[in-house]
């Protein structure tokens, strides 16, 4: 009887394992909704915090964009090697929210563009 019960449990376990999918298919995550800004972000001279206005940018993508500025065009932004396909899609979807002002070298040091030091 004990052997029969053990065999039935083993068969049941084997059936359960066969019926459970071994992998979950990858599903592309949906992009956050695009928000239209009244005043576009000057990607060459802005600070990290300004990207908080755009869903999906702050802090990771915003940091990448600030660190790799200046850009001449949207295509320049999309050439950053560390961008994922989803991040590129997010940048393209928000293209109307960016302007490419003339880079003001020395006006905003990189560490100040990343951390303005607001601790209050």
UniProtKB/Swiss-Prot annotation:
Residues 1-28 form the signal peptide. It comes from the Bacteria. It is found in: Cellular thylakoid membrane. Disulfide bonds: none annotated. One of its GO terms (biological process) is photosynthesis. Keywords: Electron transport, Membrane, Photosynthesis, Photosystem II, Signal, Thylakoid, Transport. One of its GO terms (cellular component) is plasma membrane-derived thylakoid membrane. The keyword Signal applies. The keyword Thylakoid applies. It is a peripheral membrane protein. InterPro entries: PSII_PsbU (IPR010527). Belongs to the PsbU family. PSII is composed of 1 copy each of membrane proteins PsbA, PsbB, PsbC, PsbD, PsbE, PsbF, PsbH, PsbI, PsbJ, PsbK, PsbL, PsbM, PsbT, PsbX, PsbY, PsbZ, Psb30/Ycf12, peripheral proteins PsbO, CyanoQ (PsbQ), PsbU, PsbV and a large number of cofactors. It forms dimeric complexes. NCBIfam families: PRK02515.1. One of the extrinsic, lumenal subunits of photosystem II (PSII). PSII is a light-driven water plastoquinone oxidoreductase, using light energy to abstract electrons from H(2)O, generating a proton gradient subsequently used for ATP formation. The extrinsic proteins stabilize the structure of photosystem II oxygen-evolving complex (OEC), the ion environment of oxygen evolution and protect the OEC against heat-induced inactivation. This is Photosystem II extrinsic protein U. It comes from Synechococcus sp. (strain JA-3-3Ab) (Cyanobacteria bacterium Yellowstone A-Prime). The gene is psbU.
